[in-house]
């Protein structure tokens, strides 16, 4: 698909044909700056007869990379336009769901606020509605880590030296507690992290150096007070050990007019990896209820 002269890569698992009984889903990855790879387990939903669309957002993975783009190019609105354009390009904008993970869920919620007529529901997995709230939560978790890990990360942030082996090891300690607790990480997760490292343009510009210091273009993102404006059903999914703290997700749930919430007790930031069977069951059940 082309948008503004730039190409977005996508793949479809399942049949998008008009005869399909179940509405398709578009699956939005996180980051900003990750790739579709680590969300491939969610596309297993296609085995129930529901087409699943995976894509790499512009600047990432198999889509066009723009390392020389002005920082002002990388905005939430850019990716909102891309998501809407993808639904139209595929001819499914009259009837579809969106599943977003982490940043992808933020994008999905922002998309829902535009009230596209064909959107049936949103699943926001491990997604905050407020970046300042998310950063505060991450720092609370960091403060609870071992002193050596905490001090190494804090020192790296102060100095700007976040690529040293010591910093990377400390960050991985945090990630294995609060991002993905499966050991070892599945290949799909490794591929997404390696892709982010190979071209950090989007993550570095929109987020910043780490989860604990967000200084990029999404630093002020906060749609918490607008959540009551969302008219479609929303399922909020997160993990007990998630870097998106459970109390933040609970506060989001309270504001939604048509919201459901499921907490995965044995998961952190990736219940679709950590508790995959239950995740698929919960999500498919929600999607079916939205189509009943």
Regions found by a protein language model. Give the residues of each.
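Conserved HGGG/HGGXW glycine-rich cap/lid loop of the alpha/beta-hydrolase fold
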Residues: 6-69
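Active-site loop/oxyanion-hole signature of alpha/beta-hydrolase fold enzymes
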Residues: 57-103, 281
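Alpha/beta-hydrolase
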Residues: 142-232
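Catalytic active-site module of serine/aspartate enzymes centered on a nucleophile-bearing elbow/loop
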Residues: 258-292
């Amino acid at each position: 698909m082309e948008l503004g002269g730039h190409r977005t890569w996508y793949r479809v698992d399942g049949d998008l044909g008009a005869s399909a009984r179940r509405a398709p889903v578009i699956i939005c990855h996180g980051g900003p700056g990750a790739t579709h790879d680590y969300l491939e387990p969610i596309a297993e939903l296609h085995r129930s007869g529901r087409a699943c669309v995976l894509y790499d957002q512009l600047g990432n993975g198999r889509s066009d990379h723009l390392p020389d783009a002005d920082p002002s190019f990388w905005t939430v609105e850019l990716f909102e336009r891309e998501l809407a354009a993808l639904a139209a390009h595929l001819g499914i904008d009259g009837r579809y769901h969106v599943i977003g993970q982490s940043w992808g869920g933020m994008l999905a919620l922002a998309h829902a606020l535009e009230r596209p007529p064909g959107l049936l529901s949103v699943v926001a997995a491990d997604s905050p509605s407020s970046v300042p709230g998310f950063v505060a939560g991450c720092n609370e978790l960091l403060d609870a880590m071992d002193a050596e890990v905490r001090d190494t990360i804090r020192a790296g942030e102060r100095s700007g030296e976040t690529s040293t082996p010591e910093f990377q090891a400390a960050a991985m300690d945090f990630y294995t507690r609060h991002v993905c607790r499966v050991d070892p990480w599945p290949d799909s997760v490794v591929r997404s992290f390696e892709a982010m490292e190979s071209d950090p343009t989007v993550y570095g510009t929109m987020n910043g150096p780490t989860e604990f210091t967000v200084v990029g273009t999404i630093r002020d993102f906060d749609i918490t007070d607008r959540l009551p404006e969302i008219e479609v059903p929303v399922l909020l999914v997160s993990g007990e050990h998630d870097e998106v703290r459970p109390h933040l997700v609970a506060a989001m749930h309270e504001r939604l007019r048509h919201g459901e919430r499921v907490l995965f007790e044995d998961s952190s930031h990736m219940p679709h990896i950590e508790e995959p069977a239950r995740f698929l069951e919960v999500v498919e059940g929600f999607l079916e209820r939205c189509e009943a």
